């Protein structure tokens, strides 16, 4: 085994061998889903043909959870070279709606006008409401950034995520933002904008408003609400998120985000619930719980869930 001193003296950054190791692990269907997610979370920090090709291949994986996360990663990376393959994913109605939705969101995150025709086509023709709503968001995001001339520096989230909507304009009160978020007649983009403004506020009243949105009609909005609550890691949301995870009639994309959010909050009740629903018959839910529990185990043991690039593949478990 390589010593810590030797590893520490290595040049920081992935070697070609490390990159190949991560790509192979991501695409190895014989590996546990949590290990494949470790590779995915590591590859999203890289750029170039190898990581892009592996993530695009993973976007058509038999695991819908992994496939949608791969598409999400490409959007967060804002890799324009991935656009043709992401467009092909969006058009492929044989793929799960959660994967098509994430491809549409990724196109919006990359934000190039050449994606507009397909997003408009899918908005009109895709049979899944959650995909239609995502296309609406992506189109509005591209349009708003173009018209406002928004620079990248002004759109970076304090949570380091590329969000599907820009936060609502400053000056609105938490009460006003709550009303917009909970208004079923309001456009999806404006509700998302209110959501991200409330997240950035993050005070108790803002968190309460976000939690209330878990009762919305739109599965797409509810899944983003759960995602945001995971970013905030506020224990005040635990009971509401637990209720969502337990509801087998809820859309899998919402339950999956609730599971991941509970993993971020990580109190004892949340962990027990994740262990219970790691046996859920819906793979999107059970695999989410499995990944969340694995991440918590690494955190407890003081190890990194992501692979450390200054190490060789053979010593990753010793990080």
UniProtKB/Swiss-Prot annotation:
InterPro entries the UniProt entry points to: ARM-like, ARM-type_fold, Deoxyhypusine_hydroxylase, PBS_lyase_HEAT
UniProt keyword Metal-binding present: yes
UniProt enzyme class: oxidoreductase
Record-linked Pfam families: HEAT_2 (PF13646)
GO terms, molecular function: deoxyhypusine monooxygenase activity; metal ion binding; oxidoreductase activity
Keywords: Hypusine biosynthesis, Iron, Metal-binding, Monooxygenase, Oxidoreductase, Repeat
Residues binding Fe cation 2, per UniProt: 223-224, 256-257
HEAT-like PBS-type repeats mapped onto the chain: 66-92, 99-125, 188-217, 221-247, 254-280
Reactions it catalyzes: [eIF5A protein]-deoxyhypusine + AH2 + O2 = [eIF5A protein]-hypusine + A + H2O
Coiled-coil region list: none
Cofactor: Fe(2+)
E.C. code: 1.14.99.29
Biological process annotations from GO: peptidyl-lysine modification to peptidyl-hypusine
Pathway annotation from the record: Protein modification; eIF5A hypusination
HAMAP family (UniProt xref): Deoxyhypusine_hydroxylase
Protein role: Catalyzes the hydroxylation of the N(6)-(4-aminobutyl)-L-lysine intermediate to form hypusine, an essential post-translational modification only found in mature eIF-5A factor.
Family stated for the protein in its record: Belongs to the deoxyhypusine hydroxylase family.
Name used for this protein in its record: Deoxyhypusine hydroxylase-A
Natural source organism: Oryza sativa subsp. japonica (Rice)
């Amino acid at each position: 085994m390589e010593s810590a001193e030797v590893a520490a003296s290595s040049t920081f950054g992935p070697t070609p061998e490390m990159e190949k190791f991560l790509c192979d692990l991501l695409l190895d269907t014989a590996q546990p889903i949590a290990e494949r997610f470790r590779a995915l979370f590591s590859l999203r920090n890289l750029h170039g043909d190898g990581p892009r090709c592996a993530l695009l291949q993973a976007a058509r994986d038999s695991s819908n959870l992994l496939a949608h996360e791969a598409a999400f990663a490409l959007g967060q990376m804002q890799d324009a070279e991935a656009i043709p393959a992401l467009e092909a994913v969006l058009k492929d109605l044989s793929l799960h709606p959660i994967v098509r939705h994430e491809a549409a969101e990724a196109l919006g995150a990359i934000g190039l006008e050449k994606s507009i025709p397909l997003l408009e086509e899918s908005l009109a023709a895709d049979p899944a409401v959650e995909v239609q709503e995502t296309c609406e968001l992506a189109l509005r995001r591209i349009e708003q950034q173009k018209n406002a001339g928004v620079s990248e520096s002004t759109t970076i989230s304090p949570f380091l995520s590329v969000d599907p909507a820009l936060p609502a304009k400053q000056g609105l009160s938490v009460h006003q933002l709550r009303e917009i978020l909970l208004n079923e007649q309001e456009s999806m983009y404006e509700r998302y904008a209110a959501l991200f403004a409330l997240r950035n506020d993050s005070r108790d009243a803002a968190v309460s408003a976000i939690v209330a949105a878990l009762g919305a009609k739109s599965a797409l909005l509810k899944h983003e609400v759960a995602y945001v609550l995971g970013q905030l890691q506020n224990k005040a949301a635990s009971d509401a998120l637990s209720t969502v995870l337990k509801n087998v009639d809820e859309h899998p994309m919402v339950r999956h985000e609730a599971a991941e959010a509970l993993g971020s909050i990580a109190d004892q009740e949340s962990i027990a619930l994740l262990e219970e629903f790691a046996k859920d018959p819906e793979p999107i839910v059970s695999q989410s719980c499995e990944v969340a529990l694995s991440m918590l185990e690494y955190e407890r043991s003081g190890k990194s869930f992501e692979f450390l690039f200054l190490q060789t593949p053979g010593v990753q478990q010793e990080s």
